[in-house]
């Protein structure tokens, strides 16, 4: 009934998109799965604002996480240190001390948050996931499970405390994981540039996710991308990778200078007076994330999917380096297997098309025979 009310209301107001908030209300309060809401909306020639729905869903998840934390302990100060330094742009390890810590009770388990005097661990932000790794002294090792920024301070999540909190530690980022993340992040910048170059400067970033496995990029565009456009975009990104452009990084430069350089800024994002600029060839963006030192380090780039997430917003997911190589290798293996089945024709596509044509012709003959048999059976029955 609530869905019917929403559909009628949207049509009455001459709107063609159901807000993500309303879709989330159906999901959260009435137990309506999103795909069912999308199906009913589609039947009524309506769309769903998926970006807003995802935002509502994430907010609920964050509230659930907060609710699951039954109690935060008070911050226990070990060392007075008003300024925490992030050294992760230049280093993946550092000698550190713990300045503060506190406990938190999550889903029946006690975990801990640590703050260091300085840190090589990148905190989640700008679409990039937080670093993991470990801290170690002569009494043992503690795994860093995640890194986030809270109230401007970088906080490290651990399942247990070191035996000696006052020790000096060696902090080490999971470098293999970070390298994979950096490849995907730099590829995201090249993808953004390729989209604006091929589709037009109306393209604006609307969201992103960068982790060690893949990259996801949401952007404004008015229509589904056709296979030719996707191929051009993929080629453009791979060409930029092969140009082997060295990273040009400028830190703490005035915003006005960044604007003059033509740096891309995210709509709605709040920037300070000083910003960090990341450049690979003609790709210039404001960014606080971790990147490769040269575009060639990204390896191959392969688009895995393109879809709509709301009216006027498209989403591309892609793979880099070894994961992209695996996809390409699998496709080639499939090609070889099909070619082998068809006795290695010189023109595989033509052979498949001929096979389809022959199959359709045989199907018509079979249908005709079945019809003839059926008619003959009817005649026999009538004689009887």
Where in the sequence are the language-model features?
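Residues immediately C-terminal
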Residues: 379
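A glycine- and charged-residue-rich anion-binding loop/surface
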Residues: 1-374, 382-384
């Amino acid at each position: 009934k609530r869905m019917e009310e929403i559909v009628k209301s949207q049509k009455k107001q001459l709107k063609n998109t159901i807000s993500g908030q309303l879709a989330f209300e159906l999901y959260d309060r009435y137990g309506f799965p999103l795909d069912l809401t999308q199906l009913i909306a589609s039947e009524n020639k309506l769309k769903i604002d998926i970006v807003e729905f995802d935002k509502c869903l994430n907010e609920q998840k964050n509230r659930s996480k907060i609710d699951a934390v039954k109690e935060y302990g008070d911050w226990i100060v070990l060392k007075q240190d008003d300024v925490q330094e992030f050294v992760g742009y230049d280093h993946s390890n550092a000698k550190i001390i713990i300045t503060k810590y506190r406990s938190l009770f999550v889903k029946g388990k006690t975990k801990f948050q640590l703050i260091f005097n300085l840190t090589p661990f990148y905190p989640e932000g700008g679409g990039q996931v937080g670093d993991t790794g470990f801290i170690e002294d002569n009494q043992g090792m503690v795994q860093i499970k995640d890194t986030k920024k809270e109230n401007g301070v970088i906080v490290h999540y651990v399942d247990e405390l070191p035996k000696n909190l006052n020790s000096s530690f060696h902090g080490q980022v999971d470098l293999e994981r970070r390298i994979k993340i950096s490849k995907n992040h730099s590829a995201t910048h090249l993808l953004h540039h390729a989209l604006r170059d091929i589709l037009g400067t109306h393209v604006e970033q609307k969201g992103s996710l960068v982790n060690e496995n893949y990259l996801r990029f949401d952007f404004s565009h008015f229509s589904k991308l056709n296979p030719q456009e996707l191929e051009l975009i993929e080629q453009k990104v791979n060409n930029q990778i092969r140009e082997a452009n060295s990273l040009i990084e400028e830190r703490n430069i005035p915003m006005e200078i960044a604007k003059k350089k033509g740096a891309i800024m995210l709509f709605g994002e709040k920037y300070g007076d000083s910003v960090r600029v990341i450049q690979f060839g003609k790709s210039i963006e404001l960014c606080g994330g971790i990147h490769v030192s040269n575009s060639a380090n990204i390896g191959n780039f392969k688009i895995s999917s393109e879809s709509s997430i709301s009216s006027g917003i498209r989403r591309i997911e892609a793979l880099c380096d070894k994961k992209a190589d695996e996809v390409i290798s699998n496709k080639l293996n499939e090609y070889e297997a099909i070619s082998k089945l068809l006795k290695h024709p010189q023109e595989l596509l033509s052979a498949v098309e001929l096979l389809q044509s022959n199959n359709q012709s045989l199907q018509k003959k079979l249908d005709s025979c079945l019809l003839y048999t059926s008619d003959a059976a009817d005649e026999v029955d009538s004689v009887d």
